[in-house]
């Protein structure tokens, strides 16, 4: 590939946006906790591989800016000493298991080579982790400071904002708390936001403006059904009436990656997600390496490819990488054709925005990071039609856009709210409504409990701690992850327990704040359990 870079002859833009989010799961009361493995798997399979890819682009002097949304709960977990220590233990256990597998598969060359592949991958991840001091947030921050990526935020606990619209101060608290957390992580204000589940309701812009956020992303129909209808469809953003830019998801680039029937990840040459040695091998053999010693689970070592509906065949790494290369070329060709068909129809170069969950790449789709790497390299070196751009840079170049009010929408099934509001999770919302009203009442009651420049009394300091913890518990209860899990049925008991635990803790704090005393020992225990947002501002509910 001949060396090239982006230049003025480009006919259009492509914006790649990856959304990295996991619910806040941290259980210091247990030595091992199954749901903490959600983070450990994503670090090993997605977040570190993405950082390794970005480091290779830096090494090769590739200017391929992408946008990454890092949610506040994810950043909190990635910065938490307890979870970081547990991740190191988990990673060392994976390396030990890979070494055992090398010995076990000694007489079978095909399986032995795969065992060595995993050993090499895991040791490389450990080396990267150690080289960055176990601080992945700082590694992303450095790339942003160098201008190689743009990091955006999302709502504080990934709450579905339209379902909080009856109590707007909760929307405000979700957005401003996220802004504050971003400042603590990255030393600046976020310019863009990933609205959780791309869920939009008119009025959210007021709080985005207060947080100095300039743009957000919607699903395709959120833009296409805007009023008035957008002249350029999703191929240019619109400004909401208060000047916040809304970018629409490009349907074609989404379909080619996400679609169960047409999407690339379903190719039979790719690694099968579900066939894991944690389920296939003798339980006593894999037990020391499982997320929970009481039950089988994923280890990350998987020897089979998707194959088809019948018996699975052994994974062939070279064939999978060939598929990734073919798909990267096809994806690029499709984007080039798309841009060329649109050239001249707009008053500026057309833009295709492709937002994806980051965890699709590497975790769910094992070869997904290689696909991104190959696509970026082909785009950078082999064509002169498309320029990779961030939405923030697009707005700098094209500051004038049509004004329109987007349609209420999400990127969930059927495009609206039913994934998060249905007969499996509707019980949550009346309780949230009451808690939100009580939080606002507390904020109003204690509005004079603020710093006056004098040393606060012990009683005032204790009340401030209780108010902050009440804010944390309400924010955690509002997470969209819990109703999503309840609807999907993947870990419903855990999701149900989390909602109830946070609401009960909130009720306890509310009752103490409206009575004559606060149980400091209990408060301290709750603070240690749910330690997200150390500087949570309860006054946002006023």
Describe every region a protein language model picked out.
Residues 160, 213-226, 389-390:
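His/Asp/Glu-enriched short active-site or ligand-binding loop at hydrolase and phosphoryl-transfer sites
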Residues 9-10, 55-63, 135-152, 183-186, ...:
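Acidic (Asp/Glu)-rich catalytic clusters
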Residues 189-200, 357-361, 491:
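Conserved short loop/turn motifs at secondary-structure junctions
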Residues 9-63, 70-112, 228-542:
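Active-site and substrate-binding clefts of carbohydrate-active enzymes
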Residues 69-74, 155, 192-201, 221, ...:
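Short, solvent-exposed turn/loop segments enriched in Gly/Ser/Thr/Pro and often Arg
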Residues 155-177:
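Glycine-rich phosphate-binding "P-loop"
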Residues 170-195, 334-355:
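CE4/NodB-like, metal-dependent polysaccharide N-deacetylase domain
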Residues 199, 204-213, 229:
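Hydrophobic, small-residue-rich alpha-helical packing segments that form membrane-like cores
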């Amino acid at each position: 590939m001949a060396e090239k870079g982006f230049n003025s002859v480009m006919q259009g833009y492509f914006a790649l946006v990856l959304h990295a989010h996991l619910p806040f799961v941290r259980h210091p009361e247990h030595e091992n906790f199954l749901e903490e493995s959600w983070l450990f798997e994503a670090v090993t399979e997605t977040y570190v591989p993405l950082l390794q890819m970005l480091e290779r682009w830096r090494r090769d002097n590739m200017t391929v800016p992408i946008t990454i949304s890092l949610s506040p709960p994810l950043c909190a977990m990635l910065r938490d000493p307890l979870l970081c220590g547990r991740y190191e233990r988990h990673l060392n256990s994976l390396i030990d298991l890979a070494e055992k597998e090398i010995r076990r598969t000694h007489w079978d060359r095909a399986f032995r080579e795969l065992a060595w592949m995993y050993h090499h991958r895991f040791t490389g991840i450990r080396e990267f982790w150690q080289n960055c001091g176990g601080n992945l947030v700082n590694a992303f921050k450095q790339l942003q400071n160098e201008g190689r990526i743009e990091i955006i935020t999302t709502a504080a606990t990934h709450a579905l904002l339209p379902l909080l619209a009856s109590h707007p101060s909760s929307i405000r608290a979700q957005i401003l708390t996220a802004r504050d957390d971003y400042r603590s992580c990255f030393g600046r204000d976020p310019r863009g936001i990933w609205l959780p589940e791309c869920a939009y309701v008119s009025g959210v812009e007021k709080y985005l403006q207060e947080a100095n956020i300039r743009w957000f992303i919607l699903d395709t129909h959120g833009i296409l059904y805007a009023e008035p209808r957008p002249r350029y469809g999703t191929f240019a953003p619109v400004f909401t009436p208060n000047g916040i830019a809304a970018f629409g998801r490009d349907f074609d680039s989404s379909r080619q990656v996400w679609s169960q029937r047409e999407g690339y990840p379903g190719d039979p040459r790719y690694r099968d997600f579900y066939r894991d040695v944690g389920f296939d091998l003798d339980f006593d053999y894999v037990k020391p390496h499982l997320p929970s010693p009481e039950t089988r689970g994923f280890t990350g070592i998987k020897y089979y490819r998707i194959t088809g509906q019948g018996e699975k065949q052994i994974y062939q790494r070279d064939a999978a990488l060939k598929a990734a290369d073919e798909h990267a070329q096809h994806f690029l060709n499709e984007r080039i054709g798309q841009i060329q068909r649109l050239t001249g129809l707009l008053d500026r170069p057309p833009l295709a925005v492709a937002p994806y969950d980051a965890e699709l790449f590497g975790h769910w789709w094992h070869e997904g990071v290689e696909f991104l790497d190959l696509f970026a390299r082909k785009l950078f070196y082999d064509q002169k039609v498309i320029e990779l751009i961030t939405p923030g840079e697009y707005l700098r170049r094209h500051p004038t856009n049509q004004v329109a009010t987007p349609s209420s929408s999400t990127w969930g099934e059927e495009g609206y709210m039913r994934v998060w509001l249905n007969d499996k999770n509707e019980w949550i919302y009346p309780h949230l409504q009451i808690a939100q009203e009580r939080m606002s009442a507390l904020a109003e009651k204690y509005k004079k409990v603020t710093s006056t420049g004098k040393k606060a009394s012990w009683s005032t300091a204790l009340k401030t701690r209780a108010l902050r913890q009440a804010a944390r518990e309400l924010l955690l209860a509002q997470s969209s992850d819990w109703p999503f899990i309840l609807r999907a049925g993947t870990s419903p008991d855990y999701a149900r327990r989390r909602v109830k635990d946070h609401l009960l803790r909130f009720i306890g704090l509310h009752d103490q704040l409206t009575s004559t005393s606060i149980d400091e020992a209990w408060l301290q225990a709750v603070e240690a359990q749910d330690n997200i947002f150390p500087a949570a501002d309860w006054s946002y509910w006023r």
